[in-house]
Amino acid sequence: MVDFSLRKARNNWSKLSSPGKTRQQGSPTKLKSNAYEDFVSPRDTLQLPEIGMKDRRKVGTSMQRRLSVHNAKYIPPPIDYASAPALPTAVELPVRDNSLLSSELMKPNHRRPPVDIYGGRSLREILSNPQFQAKRFVHEKLGDATALEIDHFASNLNHLSQEIEQEIKSNINKSYNELMQVNKELAVASTELKDLRSKVQQLQVVMGQFTAMAEKRLLLEKEHFRQSNTSVMTTKSGSTGSGLLPPVKSGAAKKDRSSVIILEKIWTNELSSLFRSVEGAQKYIAPAPGRRILLESNDWMEINIATLKPLHATRIFLLNDMILVAVCRSDKKGELVANQCCSLRELTVAEESNYTLSFHFGNKHHSLYRSRTPTGYTALLNEIKSAKDELRDIYQAEEDNARKLRDSFTYLQSTQQSPSRDISSPARGHSRQRSLGTLQNTPSRASTYQENLLQNISMSMHTRSRSGGVNQTAVKLNLVYEELEELSVPVTRMNFGLAIKKLHSIENILKGITAEAEGEVMLLNLLRMKCNQTRTLITQKLTHVINTEYSDANKLESSTKSLILLGMPAEALQLFLHNRSNFIQDLVLQVGVHDNSNSYITQVAVIRCQTIKKVAIQFQKLFEGTTAKYSSVLVSWCNDEVDKHFFLMKKQLINDDQLTPQAIKISRKQIDELKSVGMDFVYKLDDFLKIHSNKIY
C-alpha cells in the first residue's frame, strides 16, 4: 500500500536535497566511458500505483483541506490623499553615476549567430543533387550545430519525407487515371477505326461507281461527237429537205443518268431492309420511284389516351411521302410489326406536353407517341414539317406549271401567223390538244408534254443550217435546256446557293442568244419562261424558309442572303425583320405572366434588346456595302420594337405595381448596349419614367 502523505514526501525531499548528506556520499573512484550505460528507460520500469477506493477518498479529502483557504473579507485601510506629501522634483532626484559600473557589465550579451545549414537552398534541392554525400553534409553542417538546429533539421527531413510520399501516391493515382483514360480512348479509337473501315469500304464502292459513270460519260461524249460529225455531213448533202422535219438520226446527246440510278438503288436497298425488319410493311408501302426513308427513330412509346400510361415501345419510319409506325412483338423480342401507316398528306400532327406528339391518321385513328429524348422529339417533328412542306411545294409547283404552260401555249398558238410553225403531225396536234384540255387535272402530263415539245424543237433545229455548218444558236439552246433540267436537282434539295448560281449562268446565256429562225424563237421563249418559273419557285421556297425558321440562325441568314442574290434585297429585308419580330414575340410568350411585374419587365427587356442588337449585326453582314440604302428600314423596325417594349411596360403598370430601381437599372443597361450598333433609345426610357414617375419606388 502506497502512502500519499505530504509530510513524508517533504521529509524525503529534504533528505535528498540536504548538502550534508551529499558530502557524506562517496565519490566514484572510476569514471565510466558511457554515461548512459546503466540508464533504464522510465517507460520500461515506471508503473502506476494501485490505490484502493478507501485510500483514494482519503487522499482526495486531504487535498481538499489543504487547498481550501478561508480568508477574512479584505477591507482596505482608509487613505487621506489630502495629507499626502508632495512628490519630489526632478532636481531633487539622485543622479545615477554610470562610471561606478564595471566595464564587463556594460558589454552587451553576444549570442551565437544562427548557422545557415542549407546555404540558401531548400532541403529538396540539396538531397536531389547527384553529388550529395550524406556523411560529408552531416560532418560539415551539423558538426557544430546546436540541439535546436539538429532538431529543426530532423523535423524538416521528416516533413520532406512525408511530402515525397504524398507526391508518390499522387503520381501513382494520376498515372492510374491516365492509364484508364488512355484505355477508354483506345476503346473509342478502335470503334471509330471499325466505323472508318466500313466507311472506306463504302467509299471504295462509290468511287468504283463514279469510275464507271465517268467511263460511260466518256463513251457517250465520243458517240455524241461522232454523231454530230455525221449530222453535219448529212445536212450538207441534204440541204434541200424541209427544215421543220425531224432528222433521221437525232444528234442530241444522251444524258447520263448513272448518278440518279445509283441513288435510286440506294433508296431501294433501304426500302428492302425496311420490309425485312418490319413484318407487314409491304402491305402498306409499295416500292415506287423516288420513294425513300428520311428518318428512323426508335426512341418512342405509344401512350394510352385515357390513362396516359405507356403501352409499348414503337419505332417510327418517316418516308418522303408516308409514315410507318411499328411496334415490338411481345412473343419475339427484337422483331417489329407494322401498326399504323398513312400518307403525309392525310396525316395531322399536334404537339403535346412532355415531348408527346398526337397523330391523326387518315382512317380517323388517333394515337399519342412520347419520345424518351428531346433530341428525338425535335428531329422527328422537324423532319415531318420539312417533308410536308416539300410535298406541298411539289404539288403547288405542278399546278402552277400546268396553268402557266397552258396559258403560254395558248398565247403562242394564237400569235402564229402561218401554218408552217406547226412542227408536229395532225395526229400529234390532236393528242396535244387533248393533253392541253386536261392539264389542270393532270400536271404530270403537262411537264411531260413540255419536255417532248422542247426536245422536238431542239431536234428539228439540228437540220437547219443556212451556211452549211453547225448552227451555234441551236447548240446554245440545247445547252441551256440541259442546264435547266439539271437545275431541278439543287432546287429540290434546298441547295439554294448552287441553284441561284446556275440560274444566273443560264440567264446570262439566254441574254446573249439572238434567235432568227421561227423554231429558235419559240424555243428561246419557252426556255425564258421556264427560267422565270424556276426563279419563282426558288423565291417561294426561300420565302417559306425565312417565314418559318426561328431556331437555326445560320439557315435563316443564308436564306436571306440567297434571296438578296436573286435581286430582291428589299423583300429579303422585310421578311427577315418580320421573322425576327415573330421570334421576339414567341420568346416573350414563353416567359409568361409573372406575379412580379419587375421580373417580367427585366426578362422582356433582355430578350428584346439583345435580339435587336443581334439583328443589327446580321444586317451589316447581309447588306455589306449597301447598308446606307436600307438602314432607314432597320432603324424604323428597331424603333417599333422599342415602342412595343414600353407599351408592354405600360400594360404591366396598370395595377398598383411599381417599378423598382433594379428593374430600371437593368432596362437602362440593355438599352445602352444598343449604342454599340448605332441605336440610341435612352430618351424613350427617360420620357417613360417622367410620365410614370408615380409608379417608381
Swiss-Prot record:
<dbReference type="InterPro" id="IPR016159">
    <property type="entry name" value="Cullin_repeat-like_dom_sf"/>
</dbReference>
<dbReference type="InterPro" id="IPR033961">
    <property type="entry name" value="Exo84"/>
</dbReference>
<dbReference type="GO" id="GO:0005934">
    <property type="term" value="C:cellular bud tip"/>
</dbReference>
<dbReference type="GO" id="GO:0008104">
    <property type="term" value="P:protein localization"/>
</dbReference>
<feature type="coiled-coil region">
    <location>
        <begin position="377"/>
        <end position="407"/>
    </location>
</feature>
<feature type="coiled-coil region">
    <location>
        <begin position="149"/>
        <end position="212"/>
    </location>
</feature>
<protein>
    <recommendedName>
        <fullName>Exocyst complex component EXO84</fullName>
    </recommendedName>
</protein>
<dbReference type="GO" id="GO:0000145">
    <property type="term" value="C:exocyst"/>
</dbReference>
<dbReference type="GO" id="GO:0051601">
    <property type="term" value="P:exocyst localization"/>
</dbReference>
<dbReference type="GO" id="GO:0030133">
    <property type="term" value="C:transport vesicle"/>
</dbReference>
<feature type="region of interest" description="Disordered">
    <location>
        <begin position="231"/>
        <end position="250"/>
    </location>
</feature>
<dbReference type="Pfam" id="PF08700">
    <property type="entry name" value="VPS51_Exo84_N"/>
</dbReference>
<keyword id="KW-0653">Protein transport</keyword>
<keyword id="KW-0813">Transport</keyword>
<feature type="region of interest" description="Disordered">
    <location>
        <begin position="13"/>
        <end position="33"/>
    </location>
</feature>
<dbReference type="GO" id="GO:0006893">
    <property type="term" value="P:Golgi to plasma membrane transport"/>
</dbReference>
<feature type="compositionally biased region" description="Polar residues">
    <location>
        <begin position="13"/>
        <end position="32"/>
    </location>
</feature>
<comment type="function">
    <text>Involved in the secretory pathway as part of the exocyst complex which tethers secretory vesicles to the sites of exocytosis. Plays a role in both the assembly of the exocyst and the polarization of this complex to specific sites of the plasma membrane for exocytosis. Also involved in assembly of the spliceosome.</text>
</comment>
<keyword id="KW-0968">Cytoplasmic vesicle</keyword>
<keyword id="KW-0268">Exocytosis</keyword>
<keyword id="KW-1017">Isopeptide bond</keyword>
<dbReference type="InterPro" id="IPR042560">
    <property type="entry name" value="Exo84_C_2"/>
</dbReference>
<dbReference type="Pfam" id="PF16528">
    <property type="entry name" value="Exo84_C"/>
</dbReference>
<dbReference type="InterPro" id="IPR042561">
    <property type="entry name" value="Exo84_C_1"/>
</dbReference>
<keyword id="KW-0175">Coiled coil</keyword>
<dbReference type="InterPro" id="IPR011993">
    <property type="entry name" value="PH-like_dom_sf"/>
</dbReference>
<dbReference type="GO" id="GO:0001927">
    <property type="term" value="P:exocyst assembly"/>
</dbReference>
<feature type="cross-link" description="Glycyl lysine isopeptide (Lys-Gly) (interchain with G-Cter in ubiquitin)">
    <location>
        <position position="169"/>
    </location>
</feature>
<dbReference type="InterPro" id="IPR032403">
    <property type="entry name" value="Exo84_C"/>
</dbReference>
<keyword id="KW-0832">Ubl conjugation</keyword>
<feature type="compositionally biased region" description="Polar residues">
    <location>
        <begin position="434"/>
        <end position="445"/>
    </location>
</feature>
<dbReference type="GO" id="GO:0000245">
    <property type="term" value="P:spliceosomal complex assembly"/>
</dbReference>
<dbReference type="Pfam" id="PF25345">
    <property type="entry name" value="PH_EXO84"/>
</dbReference>
<feature type="region of interest" description="Disordered">
    <location>
        <begin position="411"/>
        <end position="445"/>
    </location>
</feature>
<comment type="subunit">
    <text>Component of the exocyst complex.</text>
</comment>
<dbReference type="GO" id="GO:0005935">
    <property type="term" value="C:cellular bud neck"/>
</dbReference>
<dbReference type="GO" id="GO:0015031">
    <property type="term" value="P:protein transport"/>
</dbReference>
<comment type="similarity">
    <text>Belongs to the EXO84 family.</text>
</comment>
<dbReference type="GO" id="GO:0000131">
    <property type="term" value="C:incipient cellular bud site"/>
</dbReference>
<feature type="compositionally biased region" description="Polar residues">
    <location>
        <begin position="411"/>
        <end position="423"/>
    </location>
</feature>
